[in-house]
């Protein structure tokens, strides 16, 4: 492969076109690959575009030419400095290009590019090349002259030169922007036109000789070659033809693409401190300053910086200064880069419009990335864990989880990080340091990002909008979480029970149900909780704070849940009405669920027994009956439950919490259902009526149990004696006869009982309490059943009728005894003589005769 012509500097600091050009022979050209040929073509065209902006090529017969020219052509295509007194060999301009370049460009498209005007280097600006006019103009900027006024770019140019001369070069090394002279990289000067004759060639202005053949329709500018016009149009349209297959980024030149691809392939320079590698030495050298040079330290938070401009930008976080304001919309920014990026919103043409949502983009890459929002395409998959991403940047950040070395370890908890800044931010959790304060409310934060997010609360800014329901959010993560409501996505699954969640935080909280972890401990009483929210709610018991106030009536509550329950008392706007019954709801989801009552739709079917349900959560709860799963465990007594609500209700037994208070008498209850039942006592409301006997009940469950008296149903069987019972509680109480269990013990006399109701009645013997008073005669009773029987004395009510003879009775026990007359049943047997009786009282009278005989 041919060696590239090396860059040569003369004593005067000038270079020529051949110093920056590369020539190949046909033999060498055939050894190049297609990609290398494309790269050579683009680099050559760029060089020609640069040289074409420096003026016309003067003929070699000019008497002054030998003193001005720096090269002449030999047969061996070597480039040499001419000797004194020797004229250069005449050559057609195209012959000077070599055999390969002649095939790349047409003669008419690049005549005049082989000029011999000298290029000058500016050492202050990194040895950049300028022609004579631009070089002298550029030097004027260093010495402070201002030969022109007007545009913002010109003012910035003069300002930057002053800053550069004054020694503040770090400003420009930080920004990374190249200096562009007033004349521009691509000047619109034309080259020679027409045929070359033997007569002396004059160097004339291309505008004067009419050499600008190519015009741009957008900017009305004129160019001498088609290639320069093409480059100019790319700047206007930002045409990006070459796409990187690794990350999807596109470029207008193959050379730019080739340089970019080194990011993915070549990383020769590795940092010994943190292991990070770079493809360019300049980037590597700049990075090393992070570890070595940090001269500028922030007095507010102690953070240090290697560059003054970074330090200056950082200080605006504490001061809140935003010096860069957009003239279009008034939005202000603390960094020039952010301001510059924002201005593109107003200036850039957006040629690429999305057919789905109408959003438009100025770059094809941005348009392509956006379309993946609609298609759901995630082309970048991690080879380590299989996770996929829609954007290469997200994929690249994720890969650091697997690849990055974590050199920075926390001395408190041992957690390690790949970046020192991440370690510093993490350590603030241990120290409690919050250096970033909000000027509006005084609240402070541990990171700048958290402060920015918080400030949107004051500004009312909600830049993240949901495409489904037009709801907007101040944080992107809130939008992502919200969108899962529409999509139904629950990406976080519990490995223990298979339950899935839309947010990772909810999964972490749920997993503590299985592990029993309670990491949040109350400093007052030592009680621990599984979530920080539960701890905060509990602490309000000690402080007496009532942070949640009702906006309607001003009543305050210590728990948010209690406030929500209270707010149901006040009528709310219910914009979703049911067409069947007129009932209204606050959300369309609640309306849809309600409509299944009318349609009878039960879309969720159990695979075990075929039973169907109208709600998915009802199916999940039902399926636990088959599996026996009880995922919710009480941390105090170890008892497990199949529903979270049942666990919450149970935990009030240990905490003695009674959040449901009666507004009439002030009595508190641990369950809302008990409060509702209690309130029926004040109102006398008994909404559930038995169709058989007309009896009224407060609860539907009580009605169902009562109806079994009429239909004779007894679904609960005792496995020990095969006796059947109407309800579950009767069975449980009966089973204690076999086990001998008497869990309710009286502290006064030591007597124990199998039923809580019997125990409560017994306690009234010691206290003398008789809460049930007859309004007719003033007689009081300790038991409600005795009071009910007594009232029938005044009313004459006899609800229990014999189906055989029609006789009625005031008590069910009297009816049971009477029925034995018809059936002949005699259940009471004398153990002495074996005689049978239909009443217990008859048995007792009979047994007394045996006792008298014995006496």
Curated annotation (Swiss-Prot):
Residues 15-91 form the KRAB domain. One of its GO terms (cellular component) is nucleus. It comes from the Eukaryota. A zinc finger (C2H2-type) spans 120-142, 242-264, 269-291, 296-318, 324-346, 352-374, 380-402, 408-430, 436-458, 464-486, 492-514, 520-542, 548-570, 576-598, 604-626, 632-654, 660-682, 688-710, 716-738, 744-766, 772-794, 800-822, 828-850. Transmembrane segments: none annotated. GO terms for molecular function: zinc ion binding. Pfam families: KRAB (PF01352), zf-C2H2 (PF00096). InterPro entries: KRAB, KRAB_dom_sf, Znf_C2H2_sf, Znf_C2H2_type. PROSITE patterns: KRAB, ZINC_FINGER_C2H2_1, ZINC_FINGER_C2H2_2. There is a cross-link at residues 335, 391 (Glycyl lysine isopeptide (Lys-Gly) (interchain with G-Cter in SUMO2)). This is Zinc finger protein 814. GO terms for biological process: regulation of transcription by RNA polymerase II. The keyword Zinc applies. Keywords: Isopeptide bond, Metal-binding, Repeat, Ubl conjugation, Zinc, Zinc-finger. The keyword Cytoplasm does not apply.
